[in-house]
Amino acid sequence: MFIDSVNLTLSSGHGGAGAVSFRREKHVILGGPDGGDGGDGGDVYLIADNNSHTLAAYKGKRALKAQNGEAGSGRRMTGKKGENLELIVPPGTAVYDAQTNELLADLTKESERVLFLKGGKGGLGNVHFKSSINQAPEYAQKGLPEETRDVRLELKLIADVGLVGFPNVGKSTLISTVSNAKPQIANYEFTTLTPKLGLVEVDEYSGFVMADIPGIIEGASDGRGLGLKFLKHIERTKILLYMLDLANHRSLKEQFVTLRGEVEKFSPELAKRDFAIALTRMDAAENLERKVGEFLQILGLSGERSNLIDEAGKAGKNLIYKQDIYEFDDSKPYFVMPISSATNQNITELKFSLLELLKKGKFQMIFAGNLTETRG
């Protein structure tokens, strides 16, 4: 089961008490104090691990606690430190205060390790309290208390490309065509009920991670449909690929305006990310050239005919709008491309174009054969 949010009460370990003890040896009549210190309580760590994919391990658990430190003992023996509590979480996990929603930790990298709560310090044994006026102290410190915090763990998937579209627009079909992901595919809305990640190999040396997010409907930013539960998963994506259905009863303009509006309402910052547009089901569309031409005109791209790729003999190729990557205007889509996952039309061009945009992007890619550049 895909679990992307859990509430927990986390506690470190209580420090062990110091010991009150005196030397008791043969021929030593008045042995001095020899009480050892208490052991420190265990700490709480958060560790990001790529082998962890959901927060399901913590479902149904309300409280997790590190081990308490053991008490000290005679002969100046220090108590054993409490065992640490280590929470293994997927990269992309954010930790919030359950009451205030304050972000407390954000684990985005493999093997990232965060000390979240420090264990209580062990108390000092009575050996520390001997003085010239008190040769036999019968006092030792108690260990310091543990730290406790009510938290909410939220997983936000990390991907290079996030697919944004209405239900049943072909996102699952595309990701299964271009990557190793195998999502459930059927001809009804909300086939994808959990986000899926797929590794897209563009060539022998490079590729990227694509996220298939459950379909957005109008009002998603207000919680309708699958709503906010999954919109958050596109927050960490480097670029957005809006997918519009050429064979849908809604116009391309209506689809794009609605999707763009929902993303903007959810996060104005997210709406500023580099983006591109894929027009799906070109094999089933009527009046393909007219629909694409009208949509480009609506986007203010009709005067950019020099950016339309025209290659004879390849159906649909002459309908691809694409910017010059070195003169990229990020207020416009990098490309508008009709595709068909069913017939593989323009799929190769789509993969290479997305990789081009990622390599010119502002962020480092998760998976690539070469170091990526940053746009100046």
From Swiss-Prot:
Its EC number(s): 3.6.5.-
Residues reported in the UniProt entry to bind GTP: 165-172, 190-194, 212-215, 280-283, 340-342
Ranges where the Obg domain occurs? 1-158
Q: Which GO terms describe its cellular component?
A: cytoplasm
Stored InterPro entries: G_OBG (IPR031167), GTP-bd (IPR006073), GTP-bd_Obg/CgtA (IPR014100), GTP1-OBG_CS (IPR006074), GTP1_OBG_dom (IPR006169), GTP1_OBG_dom_sf (IPR036726), OBG_GTPase (IPR045086), P-loop_NTPase (IPR027417)
Name the principal localization, coarsely classed.
Answer: cytoplasm
Q: Which SUPFAM superfamilies match?
A: Obg GTP-binding protein N-terminal domain, P-loop containing nucleoside triphosphate hydrolases
List the GO biological process terms.
Answer: ribosome biogenesis
Keywords, sorted A to Z: Cytoplasm, GTP-binding, Hydrolase, Magnesium, Metal-binding, Nucleotide-binding
Q: Where in the cell is it found?
A: Cytoplasm
- In this chain the OBG-type G domain maps to 159-359
GO terms for MF:
GTP binding; GTPase activity; magnesium ion binding
Q: Which residues bind Mg(2+)?
A: S172, T192
**A Pfam cross-reference name:** MMR_HSR1
Q: Which residues form the signal peptide?
A: none
Q: Which prosthetic group or cofactor does it need?
A: Mg(2+)
User: Whom does it interact with, and what assembly results?
Assistant: Monomer.
**Which family is this sequence assigned to?**
Belongs to the TRAFAC class OBG-HflX-like GTPase superfamily. OBG GTPase family.
* Function statement: An essential GTPase which binds GTP, GDP and possibly (p)ppGpp with moderate affinity, with high nucleotide exchange rates and a fairly low GTP hydrolysis rate. Plays a role in control of the cell cycle, stress response, ribosome biogenesis and in those bacteria that undergo differentiation, in morphogenesis control.
Can you say what this protein is called?
GTPase Obg
Tell me which species this is from: Campylobacter curvus (strain 525.92)
